[in-house]
From Swiss-Prot:
Alphabetized CDD domains for the sequence: NAD_bind_Shikimate_DH
Keyword Heme in annotation: no
Molecular-function annotations in GO: NADP binding; shikimate 3-dehydrogenase (NADP+) activity
Assembly and interaction partners: Homodimer.
Record keywords, A-Z: Amino-acid biosynthesis, Aromatic amino acid biosynthesis, NADP, Oxidoreductase
Active site: residue positions: 71
Domain of life: Bacteria
Protein's recorded name: Shikimate dehydrogenase (NADP(+))
Gene from which this protein is expressed: aroE
Protein residues bound to NADP(+): 83, 131-135, 219, 242
Reported function: Involved in the biosynthesis of the chorismate, which leads to the biosynthesis of aromatic amino acids. Catalyzes the reversible NADPH linked reduction of 3-dehydroshikimate (DHSA) to yield shikimate (SA).
Catalytic class of the enzyme: oxidoreductase
Keyword tRNA processing found: no
Pfam families: Shikimate_dh_N
């Protein structure tokens, strides 16, 4: 990076934002590739979002990662959104196309990436999605894009799973009966297992893992290995951690902004940060 260059400004917005890995990932990439850019964390209360978008336009902010609770409410504030945003009703990426401030959703691409790199076998066709929030919507859309259409959805809140099931024409089952589904692929989109008050919890009964084998995919990436993944691995399941999805969706964001992919050093910086805690 030329020290005399004025860096392009990017950000990650959410509320509360907490400790985001996006600045570490993207700023390491800018530095490694010699791109004059910096990504800053911005904690934006919901009522301040319209004013923030005005600031994006006025201050020539070149892009942003968007996280909860803004993924839906930001859409009407933009000039244009991609078909992925229209399909999912959520945007996680801001970028410019000429004079148009646009929104995209790279969550679906990030979710699909590890399943495309190492696809399920021809026999692994039945999927159980645990949780029915925004990430679950991206997961379901990604699964369908991969031709995996035998999907059952379950959530602690029955109404949430019913809404998602109706939108995507899925089967639904009560949370208490989730272990009764004969699924080859288990996908956790809940916060169960996340570092903090849920860290010692798992979204799926331990004893049920022994009944079959398949793929266990956890979108949670803090801690690096969740209880769900640890127990699934011990039972012989292939496991996919949430960091793979996080890095892949961020790679698509970085590519949109710069035309370059994230370098390995940026990915390793995030892995090192997670495994050090």
């Amino acid at each position: 990076m030329n020290p005399c260059s004025t860096p392009s400004l990017y950000g990650v917005i959410g509320y509360p934002l907490g400790h985001s890995l996006s600045p570490l990932l993207h700023n390491t990439a800018f530095r490694e590739l010699g791109i004059p850019g910096v990504l800053l964390p911005w904690s934006i209360e919901p009522e301040r979002l319209p004013a923030f978008i005005q600031s994006v336009r006025l201050l020539n902010i070149r892009g942003a990662c968007v996280t909860i609770p803004h993924k839906q409410s930001i859409i009407p504030l933009l000039d244009r959104v991609t078909d992925r945003v229209k399909a999912l009703g959520a945007a996680n990426t801001l970028y410019w196309d000429g004079d148009l401030l646009c929104g995209d959703n790279t969550d679906i691409l990030g979710f699909m990436s590890p399943l495309q790199a190492d696809p399920p076998s021809a026999e692994q066709t039945r999927v159980l999605v645990l949780g029915a929030g925004g990430v679950a919507r991206a997961a379901v859309a990604g699964l369908k894009s991969l031709g995996l259409n035998q999907i059952t959805i379950t959530d602690i809140v029955d109404a949430s799973s019913a809404t998602l099931a109706e939108t995507f024409d899925l089967k639904t089952i009560p949370w208490s009966q989730r272990s009764e589904v004969d699924a080859h692929i288990l996908i956790n989109t809940t916060p169960l297992g996340m570092k903090g008050k849920f860290e010692e919890e798992s979204p799926y009964p331990t004893e049920a893992l022994a009944a079959r084998q398949g793929i266990a995919y956890d979108i949670v990436y803090t801690p690096f290995v969740t209880r769900f993944l640890r127990e699934a691995r011990a039972a012989g399941w292939k496991t996919i951690g949430g960091l793979e999805m996080f890095i892949s969706q961020a790679d698509h964001q970085f590519l949109t902004w710069t035309g370059r992919n994230l370098p390995q050093a940026a990915k390793q910086a995030v892995i090192d940060a997670l495994t050090a805690t």
